[in-house]
């Protein structure tokens, strides 16, 4: 059983099905509201539903643009990526993370960066030759955009390759572009003031770097910790090496059960 299957089964056993999701919350069949720190490994970093990308997806879908035929949205996706990285780019869409990385290594062997909002390491995105962007859309777990800096050196490298983009429907393409603009706005507006308010409870169990939560709990006790959190109505990342995310905009009181019932995490 995979980690995600384990998490889903644990939620269903305790609370029934998830009937609605909004912001950082999951609303369950048994009437319990869960605070989601996992958010599909960050693909729903801005929360569930209610985003501009979701509205854009519905609007384009209503126009019947669900095929892989040419539309104006390919150009909009390129423009969104160029705005995100503040540089002229050529983009290639892959449906597999490793395929995107393998292509990037051939183009520029000295290093490829995966774009991550609020990344704390000092990366100058505008000058990075190859950047892989995963749009922050929870319904597109298989879209990876390789953004290659548009210069003569990379143009020569690309000339020797037969790279082609995976065709995606206009509705998804439009949503991807809008999701990138959504995250650009969020990066500009959200900062430490939105994250530290949860430290009183969370930093006992996680090291917080920006909005990301890296476990302090010993790896051998992490599964037990995840179940304990679920009993306190908190959903954590099912993967030890995939960070959680603070629940933007939620009242710190959502962690009151975890505060009243702390997890004992001494090593076995």
Where are these regions (language model features)?
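Active-site-adjacent loop/helix segments that line or gate small-molecule/cofactor pockets in enzymes
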Residues: 1-25, 39-45, 60, 74, ...
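Conserved PLP-enzyme active-site core in the AAT-like
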Residues: 7, 69, 73, 83, ...
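Acidic surface patches and DE-rich sequence motifs
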Residues: 28
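Glycine-rich loop-to-alpha-helix module at the N-terminal edge of alpha/beta enzyme cores
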Residues: 35-106
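PLP-dependent enzyme catalytic core of the Aspartate aminotransferase-like
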Residues: 87, 228-268
